[in-house]
Amino acid sequence: DGRIKTINFQIESGILFDRKNKFHLEQAEELGVPQIDIVICNLYPFWEKPDVSTIDVGGPTMIRAAAKNYQNCVVAVDPKDYGLVEKALDDEFKRKQFAAKAFYHLSFYDSQIGSFFSEEKFPEEITLPLRKNQELRYGENPHQSGALYILPKTNSPLGKLKKLWGRDLSGTNVGDIYAGLETVRQFSESTAAVIKHLSPCGIATGKDAEEALDRAIKADPVSAFGGVIVTNKPMDIETAKIVALFKQESEGNI
């Protein structure tokens, strides 16, 4: 039923042999092995339908072989890179970049399969399949670069962040937002928190978001300077006015 179509001596040898090795060239010619210079492969979508039937075997084999032999072969696993394949044929640095991306892609793929099979709470080894969600303004400190990575198919609100206005988020902002969400979600009544460096400097409840936020800011207005505001209820125009005033007086994020 086609299970071993690509696990084939001719294919794998054609990908792996060294074009600069005279002995390899002679053997390839003797055995009728074709020279395969480009491998473009999309894996079975295991993340869409986690099942034994969607575990790819032949695809990863070809990808791994091509990535290992990046000096002689171009491997592409992302459709966004297809337009760069021809250029990579004459650019070893680009081929190496593609190889690194291929190995990361395989690791991402296999980690999901491992999670599917595992019944251990704390396995001896673990790899998290993280996918980049967005570039950040900086990491924990302004001199550091950073990006936000999210576990796929999770309902994390961090993966749904949408900037409506202002500067891009920093790593510190993301941490503060997470800390704020984990704080206010503990309450059923209207609750607001002002978070700074992962710690709340003001938490309050009220009859609505407006009252809760006003109380949270007034709990420690000095420490609230530059903080992140989080509420567990929708904001109305009156709440937005408090946010606007807070923004005028500090460099906090909304």
Regions inferred by a protein language model and the residue ranges of each:
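Internal alpha/beta core interface subdomains
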Residues: 33-154, 161-164, 248-253
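Glycine-rich nucleotide/cofactor/substrate-binding loop typically near the N-terminus or early
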Residues: 1-44, 125
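Short, ordered loop/turn segments at secondary-structure junctions
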Residues: 1, 43-44, 68-71, 78-82, ...
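Glycine-rich nucleotide phosphate-binding loop and flanking beta-alpha elements
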Residues: 23, 46-47, 201, 237
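Non-catalytic interface/targeting segments
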Residues: 1-7, 26, 38-41, 100, ...
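Long, structured protein-protein interaction/assembly regions in large complexes
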Residues: 108, 118-254
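Catalytic, metal-anchored helix/loop core of enzyme active sites in primary metabolism
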Residues: 19, 56-60, 174, 213
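Gly-rich Lys/Arg/Thr-decorated short loops/hinges at beta-loop-alpha junctions or inter-strand turns
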Residues: 5-13, 42-49, 67, 155-168, ...
